Design a protein with these regions (language model features):
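Short, Lys/Arg-enriched N-terminal segment that forms or immediately precedes the first helix
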Residues: 45-59
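Short alpha-helical "recognition helix" segments of helix-turn-helix
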Residues: 82, 87-101
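Major-groove recognition helix of helix-turn-helix-like DNA-binding domains
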Residues: 99-116
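Short, amphipathic alpha-helical segments that act as regulatory/interfacial helices
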Residues: 16-19, 23, 68-75, 109
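General nucleic-acid-binding
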Residues: 1-48
Length: 148
């Protein structure tokens, strides 16, 4: 009989921990940006900061992957851990990149493994993301101290 009560207490503890983890996941996966109208502005910033420009024929696959990661960080952080891309983001990026289908954007998700594997790639993305964050704060688009 004592064992059954101990198991119920353990079950209760597990349930409480799952609720706490779900709340934390929700907080961490909440996007900093939700308004898709900012994506072209962010693209312009990316072109400026990375040294690429539309006159040179647009972005190569590596640059598109970098920009995608930055967009996912701001608009769909859950995607960076295997979740789905937030509705509307793929369509906007497909149009921006000149893709015929939004599914082509999903093919760029290899950039996530590049980010995890290659230190130089990660450093570049982190620097760009930090600069974007500074500019978004300066422009009042996100609060000075967002909850992460």
């Amino acid at each position: 009989m004592l064992q059954e009560f101990l198991e119920i207490e353990e079950l209760k503890s597990i349930h409480e921990e799952k609720l706490r983890l779900m709340e934390r996941e929700m907080a961490l996966s909440t996007p900093l940006l939700t308004e898709l109208e900012y994506i072209p502005m962010l693209y312009k910033w990316y072109c400026e900061l990375s040294g690429c420009c539309e006159e040179s024929g647009g972005l190569n696959a590596n640059q598109k992957g970098q920009f995608l990661l930055i967009i996912l960080f701001f608009y769909s952080p859950i995607t960076l851990v295997g979740g789905r891309i937030v509705n509307g983001v793929r369509d906007r990026l497909a149009k921006l990149f000149g893709f015929n289908s939004p599914s082509a954007v999903s093919n760029l998700r290899d950039a996530i493994s590049f980010y995890e594997t290659y230190k130089g790639y990660r450093k570049t993305i982190d620097q760009l993301r930090d600069e974007f964050m500074s500019r978004l704060k300066e422009n009042g688009i996100i609060p000075q101290n967002p909850i992460l």
